[in-house]
Amino acid sequence: CIRDRAYVSQLPKTRHNGLGPGADLELGERLYEENCVDCHGAAGEGDVEKHIPAIAGQHYEYLMRQFENIRTGKRRNSDPEMVEQIQGFSPAQQAAVLDYTARLRPPEDKLAPYGWLNPDFPAYVRDAAGIRATPPAPPAQSE
């Protein structure tokens, strides 16, 4: 599991991650500065030595899912400080802070080159630019 996380953390970040609705980014920024910046950093860079993940450039839906899993205890390896920190967030606050977070950009050297395809997914899966290639034809049905 640790080897898998180390591998995934070294993959380049997509240049076109999924964003939220953009409805309340000012609130999201304020909440991020008040609640997240001390651990995750001003640019969402995380802290490798403290095992705090980089969250810049993550997909909004992924962030929403992980936030909820951390809050409800489904993610059992969560930092107890974070679990406590996020308990009081309303759904609107959660959406705002994670929409803001999804818009934080990783450094250029962490971004995937244009046209990069994740080697772990077949060619027909959505690539880094969000383009869906044609999937292979299904096998012929025998009668």
Segment roles from a protein language model:
Residues 3-47, 60, 65-72, 76-143:
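Flexible coil segments in periplasmic/lumen-exposed cytochrome c-class electron-transfer proteins
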Residues 48-54:
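Short cysteine/histidine-rich zinc-coordinating motifs and their immediately flanking basic loops
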